Curated annotation (Swiss-Prot):
Residue span of region 2 X 12 AA approximate tandem repeats: 45-66
Short name of one Pfam family: GLTP
GO molecular function: lipid transfer activity
Known role: Accelerates the intermembrane transfer of various glycolipids. Catalyzes the transfer of various glycosphingolipids between membranes but does not catalyze the transfer of phospholipids. May be involved in the intracellular translocation of glucosylceramides.
Binding site for beta-D-galactosyl-(1->4)-beta-D-glucosyl-(1<->1)-N-[(9Z)-octadecenoyl]-sphing-4-enine: 48-55, 140, 207
Name used for this protein in its record: Glycolipid transfer protein
Subcellular location: Cytoplasm
Positions annotated as Sequence repeat: 45-55, 56-66
Amino acid sequence: MSVLLQHQFKPLPADKQIDTCCFLDSVSHLPAFFDCFGSAIFSPIKADITGNISKIRSVYESNPSKFKTLQMILEGEKELHGPQWPKVGATLALMWLKRGLKFIQVMLQSIADGERDDQNPNLIKVNITKAYEIALKKYHGWFVQKIFQTALIAAPYKDDFLKALSKGQTVKEEECIEKIRQFLVNYTTTIEAIYIMYNKMNAELDYKA
């Protein structure tokens, strides 16, 4: 499962502070995940994630010591931007990024849990749909939702998707699933910590894209 395990997310410390540099290093490799779908139709999600990573990196590199953790970015921007916050800067970029990361997490967890369409067990549409409905749908307007429905038509077979995750190597499904579970441990913990942080700081926005 080279696409995922080559750049594992690190365990979080007890205080759940997320080191910005380590986070950016791990998350910067995730856009390649969408290449595993084998269709450019998923490129808008990939582009959105890539763009938001760049925005966060730009803020971090402007003052690495001040923005050492993601929590410090939100706190610093809240003080800097006043009433405009959280609709600005890296705070807004991370808000959207975490939703894209949640999409990946829910989809992979659904596959690892064995959820499938009994009529078409080798399709992953049910896993992608679940991830979209949980992580992204409520934040998308009618037009974007229609684009996603079109993308579903181009969803790959599970065998092809798992092979792509393994960088073209033929690996037993059980081995692929086990590697997905390994990846999800720290990845899920990190995403949950970001969501908790946004809720605690009242930084979550519900407007539609």
